[in-house]
C-alpha cells in the first residue's frame, strides 16, 4: 500500500513538473536536458567546432541539447542543409533512438571494440568536452550506493584522462552523501579547476549534484 502511494505521488509530481512539460513541448526526450542547459549557460561549456562525448547517453536528451547548441554555430546556409559545427559521439550500453548529426555507439566504453569505433569517428582528434549523466542502480544501502556512485565517476574520470584535450572539461553526475568528498578530491587531483553544480532542474528532494572539472593537470 505504501509503495502504491509513493508511485502515485511520484506520478503526480512528474506530470505536473514544469521541466517535464517543457521537455515535451520542445522535443527533448527527458527533463535532464535542462540540467545541462543551465550548467552550459553558466559555464559556457559547449562551443562551435568542439568534439563532445556523451557517456551513458540514453535516452539522449543531453546529446539532443548539445546537437541543438552546435547547430546554432553553423552558418545560416549550412543550417538549412543540416549538420552541426562540431562532432558529438554518444555512448551507452543501452539502445538509443537515432539523433540527427549524433554518432551513437552501443556498448561498454571500457571495451576495445567500442573504443576502436570511437577512434574511427574521432579520426585522431582529442575531445573538448566529456559529459556524463550516468548513474548506477541504487540499493538504498548507503555504503553500497556510495561505492557504486564512486565507481561510475571513476569510469568517467579515466575516460576523460585518456581522451580529453589538455584544456578540456568533464561534467559528471554525482550524489551528495558518503563518498562525495572522495570523488571531489579525485577531480582535484586530475583537474586544475573543479566546481560543484546544482541546476534548478534537479529536483529539490534529490541529492543529485554535478561536478565540473576543467584543464587537465596531467594530460596524456
Curated annotation (Swiss-Prot):
Any one GO CC term of the record: cytoplasm
Localization, UniProt: Cytoplasm
SUPFAM superfamilies on file: S-adenosyl-L-methionine-dependent methyltransferases
Pfam family, one: FtsJ
Alphabetical UniProt keywords: Cytoplasm, Methyltransferase, rRNA processing, S-adenosyl-L-methionine, Transferase
Transferase recorded as keyword: yes
Chief place where the protein resides: cytoplasm
A single GO molecular function term of this UniProt record: rRNA (uridine-2'-O-)-methyltransferase activity
Enzyme type, top EC level: transferase
Family under the similarity heading: Belongs to the class I-like SAM-binding methyltransferase superfamily. RNA methyltransferase RlmE family.
UniProt-recorded name of the protein: Ribosomal RNA large subunit methyltransferase E
Organism: Burkholderia multivorans (strain ATCC 17616 / 249)
Upper classification of the organism: Bacteria, Pseudomonadati, Pseudomonadota, Betaproteobacteria, Burkholderiales
Amino acid at each position: 500500500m505504501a509503495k502504491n502511494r509513493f508511485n502515485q505521488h511520484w506520478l503526480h509530481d512528474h506530470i505536473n513538473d514544469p521541466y517535464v512539460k517543457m521537455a515535451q513541448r520542445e522535443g527533448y526526450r527527458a527533463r535532464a536536458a535542462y540540467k545541462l542547459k543551465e550548467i552550459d549557460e553558466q559555464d559556457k561549456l559547449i562551443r562551435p567546432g568542439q568534439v563532445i562525448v556523451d557517456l551513458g547517453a540514453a535516452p539522449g536528451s543531453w546529446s539532443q541539447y548539445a546537437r541543438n547548441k552546435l547547430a546554432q554555430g553553423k552558418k545560416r546556409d549550412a543550417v538549412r542543409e543540416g549538420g552541426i559545427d562540431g562532432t558529438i559521439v554518444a555512448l551507452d550500453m543501452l539502445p538509443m533512438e537515432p539523433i540527427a548529426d549524433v554518432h551513437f555507439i552501443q556498448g561498454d566504453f571500457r571495451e576495445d571494440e567500442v573504443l576502436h569505433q570511437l577512434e574511427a569517428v574521432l579520426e585522431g582528434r582529442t575531445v573538448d568536452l566529456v559529459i556524463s549523466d550516468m548513474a548506477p542502480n541504487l540499493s538504498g544501502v548507503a555504503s553500497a550506493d556510495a561505492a557504486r556512485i564512486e565507481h561510475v565517476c571513476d569510469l568517467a574520470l579515466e575516460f576523460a584522462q585518456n581522451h580529453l584535450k589538455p584544456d578540456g572539461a568533464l561534467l559528471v553526475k554525482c550524489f551528495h552523501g558518503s563518498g562525495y568528498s572522495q570523488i571531489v578530491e579525485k577531480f582535484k587531483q586530475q583537474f586544475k579547476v573543479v566546481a560543484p553544480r546544482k541546476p534548478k532542474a534537479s529536483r529539490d528532494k534529490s541529492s543529485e549534484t554535478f561536478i565540473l572539472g576543467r584543464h587537465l593537470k596531467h594530460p596524456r
